[in-house]
């Protein structure tokens, strides 16, 4: 998907999204372990510093590798954007399983963010809902 509004609507309808309710009552839809990530972030940041709506987060172009070995231009929509006085950065949330099966493309996405001058963290959750964090 190349358009943030279309991506937002497609995600709302195509994937099993969970409604996440922030302390203020703000509602967002999240996927996978993103709710666990948000719980952790709310221990550190004010909820106004946490953006998860893909229509409000910058996107990045990268060269995606298909299973058949061909490459095509794709657009990456980061999971979370943290905006605060100390600087903005992105967070990508993955399960161990997803990370293992798509490591190459995940690192291509991360590279597209860092080459644009931003920092990004990769949070990988295991089945026990514990995360490993790597900063790029």
Curated annotation (Swiss-Prot):
What InterPro entries would the database entry show?
DUF7487
Question: Which Pfam families does the UniProt entry name for this protein?
Answer: DUF7487
The name this protein goes by in its record: Uncharacterized protein 273R
**Classification lineage:** Viruses, Varidnaviria, Bamfordvirae, Nucleocytoviricota, Megaviricetes
